[in-house]
Design a protein with these regions (language model features):
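Canonical Radical SAM [4Fe-4S] cluster-binding loop centered on the CxxxCxxC motif
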Residues: 2-41
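Conserved structured core elements
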Residues: 12, 37-41, 106, 139, ...
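Activation loop
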Residues: 42-46
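Radical SAM/AdoMet-radical enzyme domain recognition
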Residues: 47-48, 52-62, 71-198, 203
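Active-site neighborhood of divalent metal-dependent phosphoester/pyrophosphate hydrolases
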Residues: 66-67
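A C-terminal junction/extension of Radical SAM enzymes
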Residues: 199-217
Length: 217
């Protein structure tokens, strides 16, 4: 039996302000929007419970956000140390991280490669399709995310592309697919946009019919 654990090391903190982000909208309505960065004590306690329960079974760790890389490189290097210390049964461990890709540099790639990570990179297509993904200052993030993908290719990091299927993306699915193919992105995931608590006209959620249109059976 596999043990699967989702961790949010940066809580809801994110360096992007994607116009369709339901989680940013959701967290802003909570009594405590962010719980801050995960402490080493919390990480250690969580992993100890996981390995004690798993025995020899696989432990799957999934880091999401917000933007999990905001927790910093030292956090993930410490993660590797704690795994080596607590995994006394030498259970197989899988590590995944879902990121917007804008913070990825060569050192991050070495961390990913060393830990055997599977990285999910959020990218909605070419520069036009990715226009809803802006940073906290309202600036586009496409080139930074694409650079992160190219660096991971350079270092041989396993990654896939996660696409939020908005109407804007659905209407341009063929050129977007050609763009991904040109970049040699081999693994693509398309997920429907979820309706935030408040939605403006720039990013409308799509219907089930619209979601299915780009993928005829």
């Amino acid at each position: 039996m596999n043990i699967s654990i989702m961790l949010k090391p940066a809580s809801s903190n994110c360096n992007l302000r994607c116009k369709y982000c339901f989680y940013n909208d959701l967290s802003s309505h909570r009594e405590m929007p962010s719980h801050g960065m995960m402490s080493e004590q919390t990480l250690r306690s969580t992993l100890k419970k996981a390995f004690d329960f798993a025995g020899h079974d696989r432990v799957m760790l999934s880091f999401q956000g917000g933007e999990p890389l905001l927790a910093g490189k030292e956090f993930f290097l410490k993660l590797h140390d704690i795994i080596r210390e607590l995994n006394v049964n030498r259970a197989p461990v899988s590590i995944g991280v879902q990121t917007n890709g804008t913070l990825i540099d060569e050192e991050w790639c070495r961390i990913f490669k060393r830990g055997g990570y599977l990285v999910g990179l959020s990218l909605d297509g070419d520069e036009t399709a990715d226009s809803l993904r802006i940073d906290a200052n309202g600036n586009p993030t496409f080139s930074r995310a694409l650079n992160g993908a190219k660096l991971m290719q350079k270092y041989g990091v396993d990654f896939n592309i996660l696409v939020v299927l908005t109407k804007q993306v659905a209407n341009r699915i063929e050129p977007i697919y050609r763009f991904f193919k040109k970049q040699y992105f081999k693994h693509l995931q398309f997920i429907p946009m979820l309706k935030p608590l408040c939605v403006d006209e720039s990013g409308k959620p799509i219907s089930k019919t619209t979601y299915n249109e780009p993928f005829p059976s």
